[in-house]
Amino acid sequence: MAQKPNFLKKIISAGLVTASTATIVAGFSGVAMGAVMQYNRTTNAAATTVDGAGFDQTGAGVNLPVATNSVITANSNNAITFNTPNGNLNSLFLDTANTLAVTINENTTLGFVTNVTKQGNFFNFTIGAGKSLTITGHGITAQQAATTKSAQNVVSKVNAGAAINDNDLSGVGSIDFTAAPSVLEFNLINPTTQEAPLTLGDNAKIVNGANGILNITNGFVKVSDKTFAGIKTINIGDNQGLMFNTTPDAANALNLQGGGNTINFNGRDGTGKLVLVSKNGNATEFNVTGSLGGNLKGVIEFDTTAAAGKLIANGGAANAVIGTDNGAGRAAGFIVSVDNGNAATISGQVYAKDIVIQSANAGGQVTFEHLVDVGLGGKTNFKTADSKVIITENASFGSTDFGNLAVQIVVPNNKILTGNFIGDAKNNGNTAGVITFNANGTLVSGNTDPNIVVTNIKAIEVEGAGIVQLSGIHGAELRLGNAGSIFKLADGTVINGPVNQNPLVNNNALAAGSIQLDGSAIITGDIGNGAVNAALQDITLANDASKILTLSGANIIGANAGGAIHFQANGGTIQLTSTQNNILVDFDLDVTTDQTGVVDASSLTNNQTLTINGSIGTIGANTKTLGRFNVGSSKTILNAGDVAINELVMENDGSVHLTHNTYLITKTINAANQGKIIVAADPINTDTALADGTNLGSAESPLSNIHFATKAANGDSILHIGKGVNLYANNITTTDANVGSLHFRSGGTSIVSGTVGGQQGLKLNNLILDNGTTVKFLGDITFNGGTKIEGKSILQISSNYITDHIESADNTGTLEFVNTDPITVTLNKQGAYFGVLKQVMVSGPGNIAFNEIGNGVAHAIAVDSISFENASLGASLFLLSGTPLDVLTIKSTVGNGTVDNFNAPILVVSGIDSMINNGQVIGDQKNIIALSLGSDNSITVNSNTLYAGIRTTKTNQGTVTLSGGIPNNPGTIYGLGLENGDPKLKQVTFTTDYNNLGSIIATNVTINDDVTLTTGGIAGTDFDGKITLGSINGNANVKFVDRTFSHPTSMIVSTKANQGTVTYLGNALVGNIGSSDIPVASVRFTGNDSGVGLQGNIHSQNIDFGTYNLTILNSDVILGGGTTAINGEIDLLTNNLIFANGTSTWGNNTSLSTTLNVSNGNVGQIVIAEGAQVNATTTGTTTIKIQDNANANFSGTQTYTLIQGGARFNGTLGAPNFDVTGNNIFVKYELIRDANQDYVLTRTNDVLNVVTTAVGNSAIANAPGVHQNIAICLESTDTAAYNNMLLAKDSSDVATFIGAIATDTGAAVATVNLNDTQKTQDLLGNRLGALRYLSNSETADVGGSETGAVSSGDEAIDQVSYGVWAKPFYNIAEQDKKGGLAGYKAKTAGVVVGLDTLANDNLMIGAAIGITKTDIKHQDYKKGDKTDIKGLSFSLYGAQQLVKNFFAQGSAIFTLNKVKSKSQRYFFDANGKMNKQIAAGNYDNITFGGNLMFGYDYNALQGVLVTPMAGLSYLKSSNENYKETGTTVANKRIHSKFSDRIDLIVGAKVTGSAMNINDIVIYPEIHSFVVHKVNGKLSKAQSMLDGQTAPFISQPDRTAKTSYNIGLSANIRSDAKMEYGIGYDFNAASKYTAHQGTLKVRINF
């Protein structure tokens, strides 16, 4: 409220001003306005306006006051006094050649004041104390001037009828403010502007300004005399202005606001303007006491376009001259107008919201000698022409628009320039303006958004040595003018422009300065790509691994001498993002801490080339690697210096080019099979070096390629590979054939993967290993030149190898094969031998084949020793054809595998015969060698012990002669071939006794006469081929050690009948021995507890199996000759043992085992031919193994012969032991001897016995009808279920399977179905019982019940004739197993909704609909079976009142049921495993019926009503026919007839008096009934499986006939409209219980 008077004052003041202005306008309009007559009053003496004295009059002695709007024409040399209160006169017209005094004694308004006709004279005004003179400047038109009238109302023209322009104040002289407060106000009716101001001439001076107030209310006024600066108070209104273009006080200076004077900017907006014009001959310096403008008001312009000038804070430059720094103390604006050569100097602090720098022509300069601050949200604009601003202290220019002008802001050393600078706010496409720092300085944002500082200006410069700190976003070029110039970029700085691209302002030269980073930064343009000296000396990244320098330029140029990008101790990242095709980084990359720093060029594509023309890191004693270099998919060239990179990342098949320098690349990261390394040494410097520890690619992610570029001048390009260097690439290739050599001379171990040379037929040149270097090649290798291995170096080969030759001049080189797969080494035959290798070492499991091409006379490789090492067990080394074994040292350290799996490395010789003599080193006792013949040549062994076996690569190839044995010292060899199935030697001859500790795999083996061969041992125990006993006489011997495995087709023969012995010293598989016409002398089996497998026939004068167990492994095995002794088990399997002739004696330990395969009828038999006899006492147990997987669905008995020719069997078989395998448990077996003395096996069907026994031991043993149904099932042997059952392996599974089929749940489902309908009938009885009371006076005072027979709830008495009711209910019932019938658990939920009415006083009728859902879970042996019943019922019901207190009630019901059943069935798979399946039934059922009850009501006690009741109920359920689905073999078709039931119902209910509790009436009730089934039956359902001939019989009804009910209820009524009820009932019968809850809602109408 305190503000209201001021507010009202402003309103009133505004109204008065408006009214006054309107009056003036109307007056000046004169006749045209038709309002007031305009007069021209002339003076003739001292004049006063209020009475008109001294003016022309209407007559003598009459003083007519000067009227409003009159023009006063001064004709006499007399003073004029304006004393009309609030006088509003048109103007003053000087028409006398005198300067006149004008006194303002009352507030007066004047239009023009002119001396147009007397220009040498003026009006000197004196304004009285507290009075005001308001100048409107209003002129008159020619029409007005010609029609003005005198006091006599006669036309008296002004200015001879000529017009006087608006704002003509040429007649103003001095203005004397006599006493405070005197006011001079300019309220121009035609406001002037700065461009055309109202000008007060040189004669317009101020006298006693200390008493005055100057108001510039409307218009722009220019003053020419310094005295105006002495006015005590100057007020400038909004959008109005005052211009000082005045004489100076002294020495060209004008003092403003001295002596307490003030210049104020009034108005709400504070947009008044003060213009200070510097002009030669006038004031050029303006000394300001205090400051101009403030509180965001006042626009001050300093104009030096005519002459250089200075705006000075009188208190010194450290004081404010424009605005103040106290919150909102800034001036609204500050404009500096300059011109070329006419500079403006501001010697004081400037605080203005907006600053404008404008130069009339290019070259204007403004110097701020102290602070400049536009504050938050302030702005600076440059206009008109190019200009230069020099600041001396910190400056804040805010949002600065260079206006597309060549503006330069110069910042001195150690000062801060604040602002947001834009080249052209109107067109962002233009770039203009330069910010120049003399040395140290800071450029920061002056906006609330600190990010954007510079937008599209030409440049930010550093002229001298110093650090300029930048932050935010700068759209400008950075220029460095001194070697010591540094730009320091804060975290997040963005430079949208180049660095050192163009010369500094005034074409000052660029210099190799530096850039330092305090955090992440972005530079989008080229760096150092300008003229001479543009290259930068240093770029130093932030000492923070997380910070990133993003460079988007295509040329990043450093100084030739020492130009470097420095990664500090913690690293940092350089990100290269240029989209240009060619990108050059001409800097060394200096790394402070090993494995730090990142260069990220991941955004580059394969169309771009990145060149790093400088060193990266340091290689040497103090190696420092760049942490990571990601080249993206670009072509990256690393030249002009050594390179040390910890991780080189290549994406999308990028490539890196290595020139003639040294490169350390600890690791490459690339997608598998991507990335290329190009070895591109220049024509003069042909060598490229990979420093120790380099890894190109990896085993998991090899490079795509390592490539030798176009050959150098000398024809080759050499890659020198340091210690531990690994090269992983798919291919190592060359552009030119025979160019590219790999030299490993630094020691250590290296790996080279991929294919080396040979692509498109272009081979590499050569390979050199020296100085103890180990190199492992993983892929195919192709060199045009030779391979040299010296200085104890090792060449490891994993794949095919092509080279001219392999040599070791100092005989120290090792060629090692580490291949896992077969490989070939291809060499060129030579004219002479090269240096011999120390050794060839085989270390891998793959085979190696040497191959030579060409026509030379000397082998391309020579070696002293061959050694098998590491994983070479089983590997084969194929020597060059024509290389003999005679002089080679052959060693092994790989052993020979396990005892059961002998193995050996293999040396293959071909194209030449070899001889092995004593003293030659071949293997040792723990490391056996395998020698193999690769051609049809021979090996002669004269060495007593040869730690080797001999093999062949092709069957019937190679001859071996063994002569190393001496008397009492048989020769030793480790096998002739390895095992059955291997290629066979063509011929083996034993000339001396021999122990062969291996197998014999040979087409022909000859054991000379009188020579004994013992064969089999650690190297093998197989025999495949033919052994001939004796060279002539047949008297040779062969012994087979334990576990001899003869091939079934093997043969042992003698050169003479009944000569030669064969002995088995242990277990054996035996082939053919002798023949029927040339039997051998003896065949003996001498081992203990051993067995023999007979695969062929034996013909010998004497066969002695000793206690061996015999297994017959061929379909027919013949034993022939003289005598045969057997005293062990004979296992026939399913084969025949034929005794062809002679006598066979079976000892006491003899037993017989045979196998019957029922599926094909095969059984092992003994066949005793006509010429043979078998003598045996009673044998041991006869084991009969039966594999019975055949179907048991057969009838009768099947027979199989065990001994044929039983009449020639002198003995008795022991009691049989049947060992049945398979899944057939339904068959019985026996062994008998028939009439012809043959022994016979019998097989009999036993299904009925197995099933009956299984069911008798199961849970369904006592289920009613189950045994009858099982008999029916087993009679139908053609059903799928029957045949599936025969797959069972477990009798308990059989009982489960058949029990699920032979039992059912029909009785339970039918019972529950009828019970559900009965529940709905009971609920209808509830309603009938209630309505009956409406017509019975005996019940009028007793709460009604709705409990009918077997009811489940109580109802209150109805007091209305009709209503709608709903009763939801929930029932849980459980029937335990009874009479062998499986029980069940049932849950029923439902609701009945009815509508009824009274037909008359004694008859009620109604209809209802009910919905029920019952879930049945069957129990006991039917557990897991489920049935769901959904019912929809429709009912009619009624009640009739008979004679007093007697009544009848009844109902009829019709129910539609949807029944879904899920019954468990089973299925056996082929392995006899039982799997559960679900047989689903889905059928509809109809149930209908009705009931009729009679009863009597009487009041037994006061308030107690007893109602005995009795009646009958009848229900009937329809037939069902459906087929189950869902099982494989056990779906049944079901057909059932109807079910029905007649029940007698007897019981009573007792209803108590109503209880009123808070107007809520409660009616209690209790009841009990007995229900007895008097007639009816459940349906006898019939079911059949597909293919079944007779139906199953359904299980009978075992439920109790009598059940009992007791229940209680309560009905609640709150008003006549609504009733609610709740009830509970319990039902019980034999092994049956049920609980039911009921709710009720009823609306009475």
UniProtKB/Swiss-Prot annotation:
Gene3D superfamilies found in the cross-reference section: Autotransporter beta-domain
Autotransporter domain sequence ranges: 1357-1645
InterPro entries for the chain: Autotransporte_beta (IPR005546), Autotransporte_beta_dom_sf (IPR036709), OM_autotransptr_brl_dom (IPR006315), OmpB_passenger_Rickettsia (IPR022095), OmpB_ricketsia (IPR048195)
Family matches, as PROSITE patterns: AUTOTRANSPORTER
GO cellular-component term (any): extracellular region
Keywords: Cell outer membrane, Membrane, Periplasm, Secreted, Transmembrane, Transmembrane beta strand, Virulence
Propeptide: 1329-1352
Function comment: The 120 kDa surface-exposed protein is a major structural protein which may play a role as a rickettsial virulence factor and/or immunogen during infection. The 32 kDa beta peptide may serve as a membrane anchor.
Family of this protein: Belongs to the rickettsiae OmpA/OmpB family.
Protein name (record): Outer membrane protein B
Originating species: Rickettsia typhi (strain ATCC VR-144 / Wilmington)
Name of the gene this protein is made from: ompB
